[in-house]
């Protein structure tokens, strides 16, 4: 864990926007990650880790090879960084997929040094259709 330092709301919003761009393009913008960034990714029944910017990006590309969109996200500052809640949509040969995720990011020198990501798992088109048929959400 990194040492707690004050993080400005402006920097949190900048990093959240850079992270969303990363999710949508599978390319890490300059200034988003430290060179030795550590990722701890928890999936419904699996856990993966990566160290370093290149490994982080490679893990992302393996799990989400298609570019997508982030229709909604919210960032909240923490003493050591921020928490980002986000949703993703992407399309492949099977159709449009969906997932919801939560990331706790610790910063060092204004960049993400550690990230713990919790993912609902990827909902394929059939799961999305079944959910839409059986569940009425009060909020998107």
Each language-model region and where it sits:
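Short, flexible active-site loop motifs that bind/organize anionic cofactors or intermediates
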Residues: 2, 19, 46
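A beta-strand edge to alpha-helix "cap/lid" segment located at domain peripheries
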Residues: 2-7, 58-140
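Short acidic-aromatic low-complexity motifs
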Residues: 5-35
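Alpha-helical structural motif
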Residues: 11, 15, 25, 52-55, ...
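Generic detector of well-ordered alpha-helical segments enriched in charged/polar residues
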Residues: 13-20, 30, 57, 128, ...
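Generic detector of low-complexity/intrinsically disordered segments
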Residues: 17-20, 41-43, 105, 109, ...
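Compositionally biased, low-structure terminal segments
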Residues: 20-23, 34, 57, 83, ...
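A solvent-exposed, acidic/Ser-Thr-rich amphipathic alpha-helical stretch
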Residues: 27-79
